[in-house]
């Protein structure tokens, strides 16, 4: 799951080397924390949160296949 997210986000940001993805496992769902360069936060969130919503939708679709529940948090 982390590889998929990193691949997508790396194509959006100016500083892909600063992408940090951390997965926190919980009982009912796993939380994925995404950190990017402060200059790239706006690019990952997008206008009115459109890109962030799309990333969450992709993550939800992939989580069905994996049989787990994932939640995306973008940390600035």
Curated annotation (Swiss-Prot):
Residues 29-76 form the KH domain. Its main location: cytoplasm. Signal peptide: none annotated. It holds the Pfam family KH_KhpA-B. It is found in: Cytoplasm. It comes from the Bacteria. The keyword DNA-binding does not apply. GO terms for biological process: cell wall organization; peptidoglycan biosynthetic process; regulation of cell shape. InterPro entries: KH_dom-like_a/b, KH_sf_prok-type, KhpA. The keyword Cytoplasm applies. PROSITE patterns: KH_TYPE_1 (PS50084). Keywords: Cell shape, Cell wall biogenesis/degradation, Chaperone, Cytoplasm, RNA-binding. Coiled coil: none annotated. One of its GO terms (molecular function) is RNA binding. GO terms for cellular component: cytoplasm. HAMAP family: KhpA (MF_00088). Forms a complex with KhpB. A probable RNA chaperone. Forms a complex with KhpB which binds to cellular RNA and controls its expression. Plays a role in peptidoglycan (PG) homeostasis and cell length regulation. Belongs to the KhpA RNA-binding protein family. This is RNA-binding protein KhpA. It comes from Leptospira interrogans serogroup Icterohaemorrhagiae serovar Lai (strain 56601).
